[in-house]
Amino acid sequence: MNTKAFASVADLEEKPVSFERLSEHAWAYTAEGDPNTGVVIGDDSVMIIDATATPVMAKSVIAKVREVTDKPIKYVVLTHYHAVRVLGASGYRDEGLEHIIASYPTYELIRERGQQDMESEIGRFPRLFRAVESIPGLTWPTLTFKEEITLWMGSLEVRILHPGAGHTKGDTAVWLPQERVLFSGDLIE
């Protein structure tokens, strides 16, 4: 039986945050029951996987990243479209952000129901959206792909994959083949 508590209307207590190294280049920013954020530190830049709920929350991720590197945060990957995972993307703009990356089906979800999802999640997760006023609006990808895109962060290969519909129609996973690390978004809980 799963005993983990997930974020909800009744969940108003702060969760302890952990920032754990998974491999040479991969880190996990987690708080029990909250959406997680992946961090990939390449030779020349940083990738964030799932941006948090608000730009204010993103600052907490940035602070942890800055404890281990001063490289620019050039990429934010949206593993799927749920407001609690993506609306913090604008918080990375001052850190060197060049691209917000999502599958094309995720882009379609934002277009079709992004505003509705944002309003619903803000109402359902008050703790995660305490700084709702910091959100400038919907998060739109600047780079989309249909099945797969490969980025090289210096010598580190990063594959961003859309294997098909799962948790949403736009699910994306980030695979580091050299290190055998997979960031799966909400495909696995």
Language model feature labels by segment:
Residues 6-21:
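Short acidic, Pro/Gly- and aromatic-enriched capping/linker segments at domain boundaries
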Residues 17-18, 29-30, 133-136, 140-142, ...:
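Short Gly/Pro-enriched turn/cap motifs at secondary-structure boundaries
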Residues 19-64, 172-186:
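Conserved beta-strand hairpin/beta-sheet module of binuclear metal-dependent hydrolase folds
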Residues 28, 47-50, 74-78, 159-160:
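Short catalytic-loop micro-motif centered on adjacent basic/acidic residues
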Residues 33-36, 46, 53-56, 81-85, ...:
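Solvent-exposed loop/turn segments at secondary-structure junctions
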Residues 45, 71-74, 96-98, 156-158, ...:
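Loop/turn elements at helix/coil->beta-strand transitions in domains of secreted/extracellular proteins
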Residues 63-143, 150, 169:
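Active-site HxH/HxHxD metal-binding segment of metal-dependent hydrolases
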Residues 144-176:
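Core dinuclear metal-dependent hydrolase active-site scaffold
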